[in-house]
């Protein structure tokens, strides 16, 4: 449908905000998508920035003391920043491995292959 327009992307980029254009190609952030849909041409919208897959966001990592006291701390996913203190970095040191999974904090979902992950 927009195959011809894709090859003519240079012509379309004239109407596309330069910042929006760069973010569209590199980051594809949702916030940029909103701008793209308003300011940029069709070539710089959903075609270049596909919608992010239905991947549930990583649950926030609770503070370590609270986790160690009330819940069994599970290994935090790479998506979650290590908010726990060095004492609690070893999950086994906080709670015994015999902790039932029901009492454990839900681990982050597996990494979703999304090119639109926000860059920190």
UniProtKB/Swiss-Prot annotation:
Pfam annotation, one family: LELP1
Family per similarity comment: Belongs to the cornifin (SPRR) family.
Designated name of the protein: Late cornified envelope-like proline-rich protein 1
Organism listed in the record: Mus musculus
Source species taxonomy: Eukaryota, Metazoa, Chordata, Craniata, Vertebrata
